[in-house]
Amino acid sequence: MPGVIMDEPNVGGHPKGPSVPDSSRNGIPPLSGSDGAHGVSSAHNDGANRLNGSAKGIDGYKQNVDSSTTKIDFVGLRQPPELPHITQGFFPFSKLVNRSVQQCWNELSELITELAEVQVPPQDSGPLPGAPNGKPLGNQSEQNLQKKLRLLDFAHSKRAEFIKLLVLSQWSRQAADVSRLIDIQNFIRIRHQAYAGALQCIGDMKRDLVQAQVGNPDLKTALEVLAKGKVVSMPTLGYKPPRPLTAKGALKRLQKINRLISARLVLSDSVPTPFQTYRVHDGRVTFIVPDEFELDLSIGAEDETSQFYFVDIRFLFTPSSPIPKGRIFNELDMRINDTLRTKGLAGCFDLLHGLVLTTKINALFKQAAELARGLWSDTLRVELLHRTLVLQYWTLRPGPKSWLEIGIKSGRRSSENSINGLPSIGLRWIRDGQEVDSRDIEFDSKNLSMECILRSVIALHTSHILSSAFEKLSKHSLFSTGALSLRGRLSRTEPGACQLDVQLTRSRHLRVSVEPMSGTSILSTTPSTLERSDVDRNTDKPFADEIVSRVARLRCISAIEEVESNAKLLGFQVVNPRSLKLDFRRHFPANILRFSFFWHRSWERNWVLAATSSMDGDSWWVVQLQPAVPSESALPFDANSGISAPRSAQIVCNTFFPAPQHNMKSPFADMGHSLYGILTMQANARYLADLQSISFHPPLPQLVIEASLQVPDILIHYQALKLPRAFQVAMPAELARRSFIKDTIRLAFSGVDPHEKAAVLVAYGELLSPPNDVGALVSKQDRSLVLHHGGNKFAIRLLTAAGRSAMCELLESLQRLECALSILETLRRKKMQPQSLSLSRVGFLYGPRAELSANIDINLTTSSTHTIIDPLHLVTQEKPLFQLRLGIAFDYPNPHRRMQGSFTSLLNNAGATSSLGTVTGLLSVTLPLMQALDGLMANPSHKDPLRVQVIARNAKTFQIHYPMQKVRFQLLITQRPNSLVWVLREAGGLQGRSSEDQLKSRLKERLYHSKGDGWQGLENGVVATIDKVGNLLTELDKCFSGLDDIPILNQSPLETKPIPSKPTMGNTEPAASGNTVQNARLENKSPQKAAATHSNADVITID
């Protein structure tokens, strides 16, 4: 039985032997006076209670030794030997009980916890049904019943276990008897084994003694030999020794053997195909098997059926050594001869062919083991399985493994490279866990070199990896289009010669190779400028994909670093993407591996450049940020700059560096210039796209930098009448009759102004019907406008910051040009002589001899800062941004300079009689008058007192006031049936003044009832022609020239208020601000009156 459960807790002991017995054995106390060494025990009255004898400790044993020897010997003759006690597999019953109780408690606790988690629905408050015995049934829900059932099952199972424990407890009270039975059975088994062992030993001895038998000596024959020197009873055969062979005889015999061998091989013997190459010489035939061995055979009889005999063998491959003479050679000789006797030449070849193949594999195994212990340690694993050599290389590389198997192919498959189906050494190549063709492996069966085979395998593996990487890289547009070079060098025998040269940028190159021993990819750059470690490798990818990803990553890093270093030289600042709050993957393609953002101090802060690099190409992007709020600060971007997510991102160039040309001194500087221009053009095109009411070409996706780094132009469809209302300029009715500009405007980038640090844009256009010689009117110093001499083309120069739209300035300038051309046409129609032309002024000459000059100013004012207004807001805005106000200016000494305010008001009034034609007509009409007034004002000394005042109510009405006499006259233009005339009337001052009769009589006599050159009195006024009004004013002034001695009573200060030196430019004509006052000063002959008059001269003359 396997074990006994004892009721006592201290049961135990050594498994075998009575060396150190326990204090009790099998539950029986030891017997005193026993000797464990001799198996002797004392006789006691309680001997019936012990089993298998008893044992004592060592102390008891020593005590017994000191006892009487006679007693011990006597007792030893009577007592049986001590039996070994078996205690292996015994354990206390109390431990089983404790374990069972503990397990029961644990399971009960778990059950209570589980049952507590079960939710039992509450019992209904109604009357409960009673059981047959009259007791209530309680809660009869399914959950409650399930809980009760589980408790009942647990109690039943544990009850069964404790019943088993009870049975074991009752049985263990008789365990002592069972233990004694186990000890007896063990004793019997040991005795049986000793008996069987004795029999076996005797049989072996009997068998071995057979070889030790020696025959009895033949004393009789020995005595005869010693006495006579011979044995008479031994028969003789009569053989005669052969005669010694001479050289000639030996040669004849060898030649005869050669003939016999040749005849046999040709006529009778079946020579296998591998033995077809042979030569017969020196009485033997030498079979030659290329790359394997040379076999020498000979014959022992002339009979054709006799066998060949082995003579010698030589291996034809290296490394190999000759078979040493001795036991090995003899065994080979015997084995070959037996094969020749039984299987002939074919069997001999099969034997030796297999021997050679095995020898070659063993030689390769030894070489591989030496490599694994030498330079290839830790990277090479070698194993020989029967006759198959397994060589695993690149053991430290993660991922699928690669190995080479060199074994013997049976040759039964027709596809195998074997001769007539013979076995041969074959290669099986497992590359990255998959079997591939091994025919390209360099294997020399004659000169065996495991290192050459291994290097060939690694070279082919490396070539496969690099060629796969080459194919994957060549699919990217950078290499497929020839923008970057990609060249691979492969080898079948030398892994160090396998390289992949990749051009990262125009100045940086990368060489990819694989370290032969460890299989690690090596990437080296030229020049070596990449300092960051390449640690982010993905071991889950195939090796070729890993190389491609690393090459792509390094190429993009190199390209971005080179761009950043060149961009910083041009003043570009690298912008941290975090400060832009930019989700890069949302606005840019997913294949981009590296990117960088740039900004320049002269750009608007809502535009940046992005340089992106991928294996499909390097690109420049123009990124517009939102909100588009320009900033005056030129500080770098930060998180608090107020710029949020990008609004748009547009690719503008597909290369970082332009193709080098003979006229390029600094290619990247030219690229920076083009980037500056394309950003400016993109900003304007984006502004037009947002307006949605002005068409343009090319569209935004096609607005990119050209191959020659030329910034493309934008063609804008311009029609002033179809512009949004916010951009339209309200022209005067006379100027807005027709358009002067064709509807196509070409906007071109023309560089950067070094002083203003702004982009220069030029708008080119054509005139529909250009005036004659209009190009000569534009001054060469005016850089804002150029008109082609003798042609119909013009150009407008604009300055704007990069990233800021110039559309408002362009539309304003175009409408200014149309306004200037309309004014020019009107002047020529009015027979005026144009002198100059610009976007803000038109100069012309007038007068009888064109001796007077004037300038019409074109002033456009804006109601707000339109450069920061959202174009989407401008589309719906009805209020125009531009307010047109024309002005006219006269240079000194033009007499019309005193009428400048009146003419300006007349130009800007909305009345039907207010127009440029009216003003030009009034210039001719009022010129004689203004010249006459200038004559009245001639006062070189500027010391004479104030004598006359002229107030211009408007360009057609004047008031002449003599303050000292308090007399006013009104001079105005009146239309007669055939012409215009000036009419002079009294405006007040002479009625009811008797003291001024002399003045009245003078006026009537000289003016009202008189007639002069170009004028005529009308009794109550005077009328004068346009060109002779000066004569009238001269005669009028003469009427007052002789009145200096006439006293004027009740003289009061002048009622006229001081007039400002420059009139107010208003739309109406108030008397105080819109009039022009002209003062004439005449000589005063009375010093006292001159002083008094001078003290009261507080009227300011407008000049």
Swiss-Prot record:
Record key words, sorted: Activator, Nucleus, Transcription, Transcription regulation
Single GO MF annotation: transcription coregulator activity
GO biological process, one term: regulation of transcription by RNA polymerase II
GO cellular component: core mediator complex; mediator complex
Compositional bias per record (Polar residues), positions renumbered to this chain: 1073-1103
UniProt-annotated location(s): Nucleus
UniProt region (Disordered), positions on chain: 1-63, 120-140, 1054-1103
Transmembrane segments annotated in the record for this chain: none
Subunit note: Component of the Mediator complex.
Known role: Component of the Mediator complex, a coactivator involved in the regulated transcription of nearly all RNA polymerase II-dependent genes. Mediator functions as a bridge to convey information from gene-specific regulatory proteins to the basal RNA polymerase II transcription machinery. Mediator is recruited to promoters by direct interactions with regulatory proteins and serves as a scaffold for the assembly of a functional preinitiation complex with RNA polymerase II and the general transcription factors.
Homology family: Belongs to the Mediator complex subunit 14 family.
PANTHER family membership: MEDIATOR COMPLEX SUBUNIT, MEDIATOR OF RNA POLYMERASE II TRANSCRIPTION SUBUNIT 14
The protein's name in its UniProt record: Mediator of RNA polymerase II transcription subunit 14
UniProt source species: Aspergillus terreus (strain NIH 2624 / FGSC A1156)
Gene: rgr1
